[in-house]
Amino acid sequence: MSKDATLPVRGTVAELKLEKKLPKKIDAIIVAIFEGEDSIELAGGEILDFIFSTEQQADILTQLEAVGAKATANSITRVPGTDVAPVIAVGLGKADLLDDETLRRASGTAARSLGGFENVATTIGDLGLAAAVTGFGLGSYSYAGLRKETEESKDKTTTVTFISTGKDDKDVFVEAQIIVESVLLARDLVNTPSSHLYPESYSVIASNEASKHGLQTTILDEKQLADQGFGGILAVGNGSSRKPRLLRIDWKPRKAKKSIALVGKGITFDTGGISIKPGASMENMISDMGGSASVLATIIAAARLNLSINVSAFLPMAENMPSGDAFRPGDVITHFGGITSEILNTDAEGRLILADAIAYASEDKPDYLIDAATLTGAQLVALGLRTSGVMGTDEFRDSVAKTGREVGEQAWAMPLPEELDEQVKSPVADLRNVTNSRFAGMSAAGRYLQEFVGADIEWAHVDIAGPAYNTAGEFGYTPKRATGQPVRTFVQVLKDLSES
């Protein structure tokens, strides 16, 4: 058993509550404002009127106009408010352009402005409770890591109360909270340094998290991986003294008719191996297990939401290190299932461990299979820091990409051009792990993985190299470092499949 069997630290987050009336102790009330034709307008309906009288609303608007408040999306303005409490106004832009993502981002921005407040209430849920809860929950996240704590550095938990007037509000609130908590789990895992999160410890931590929710787990160690022929995972992981693992997790509800396999890349640190990466920014490679973290979080959410779909998650875990035991360019490895692959670049290791896990998952003959990976720099070149690339069988690929855009996790469908068929072939093996071309690197990786997907399985490969880890500034409900993408996309895909 690994000594690191639990996460060393978790991020802090606001405590969200749903109440039918305003709490007695309140430090501020967060309201939303729209851009009107000539002036700003308070945004809301029943809940706004429930808390503030017509005269109080007019007074708040007067105060906001007096300080030159703008209602552009994500703007924040503080005013004295009323005798109820001071007011924090967050802008939503024009009312006719409001959508869930605008509301999520504004709520996240508001959540990040609450330093110094212990108890706040908000009327923003009046405009879309699920989106507001998601924005506040994700936006309030802060990760201090392993810094020595002082009284000044202690994060004081803020309580955010949503006022409820609808009969279905509790169900909406609880579901949104579960999804938020799942995203936060993925963030915590990705933010954990590789000194504390490595294949053995990660497999135990993930298994423990899944077991809390009644999920069945199985861990294969390096000996079992060798006995069963997982040549890709072993090739990548054997260069490290921290040996590889493969974790399987199952959610099997009664009467479920459909099945899906989730596969996530779990490289706990990536040096590039013998094809070593440049030293600059290599510390960000703690995030190279982001795909596996999202898969773990998704199957836990499926269990907590009691989704009626059979879900099996596969998390191949390895540390890609250079050593005398590391695999080399020119090696030929044999994947699970027998396909051989020539290694041209040891820094194209993610597809090797995914290939084993996809072939293994395909033996169950699931109806659908999704894999997620921080896989290629080519994704960043093609789509940038915030948009995932989705490849796979046409209809399912398009559906997953569309779902991502709907929940606010930007995604774009990408092709697997037929000319790549010859480029992924090797003269000395069935495949080569990279092509000899610098073009279409993201699609080439997807084309490699396609070889391992079983027949008649609807498949989507999601490259999250940029979106999984935010190296730029925080925005909306997205913090620096781990983002938790694409957990919300995957949970919604599972919900849609379970209900269809």
Curated annotation (Swiss-Prot):
Q: Name one GO cellular component term.
A: cytoplasm
Keyword check for Ribonucleoprotein: no
Spell out the subcellular localization from the entry: Cytoplasm
What PROSITE patterns has UniProt attached to this entry?
CYTOSOL_AP
Specify which residues bind Mn(2+) 2 according to the UniProt entry for this protein: K265, D270, D288, E349
Cofactor comment in the record?
Answer: Binds 2 manganese ions per subunit.
Any idea of its EC number? 3.4.11.1, 3.4.11.10
Gene Ontology MF annotations: manganese ion binding; metalloaminopeptidase activity
Catalytic activity, as annotated: Release of an N-terminal amino acid, Xaa-|-Yaa-, in which Xaa is preferably Leu, but may be other amino acids including Pro although not Arg or Lys, and Yaa may be Pro. Amino acid amides and methyl esters are also readily hydrolyzed, but rates on arylamides are exceedingly low; Release of an N-terminal amino acid, preferentially leucine, but not glutamic or aspartic acids
Q: Name one GO biological process term.
A: proteolysis
Disulfide-bonded cysteines: none
User: Pfam families under this entry?
Assistant: Peptidase_M17, Peptidase_M17_N
Q: Where does Mn(2+) 1 bind?
A: D270, D347, E349
Alphabetically sorted, this entry's keywords are:
Aminopeptidase, Cytoplasm, Hydrolase, Manganese, Metal-binding, Protease
Active site: residue positions:
K277, R351
Entry cofactors: Mn(2+)
Q: Which SUPFAM superfamilies match?
A: Macro domain-like, Zn-dependent exopeptidases
Q: What does this protein do?
A: Presumably involved in the processing and regular turnover of intracellular proteins. Catalyzes the removal of unsubstituted N-terminal amino acids from various peptides.
HAMAP family, per the entry: Cytosol_peptidase_M17
Q: Which family does it belong to?
A: Belongs to the peptidase M17 family.
The name of this protein is Probable cytosol aminopeptidase
Which species does this protein come from? Corynebacterium glutamicum (strain ATCC 13032 / DSM 20300 / JCM 1318 / BCRC 11384 / CCUG 27702 / LMG 3730 / NBRC 12168 / NCIMB 10025 / NRRL B-2784 / 534)
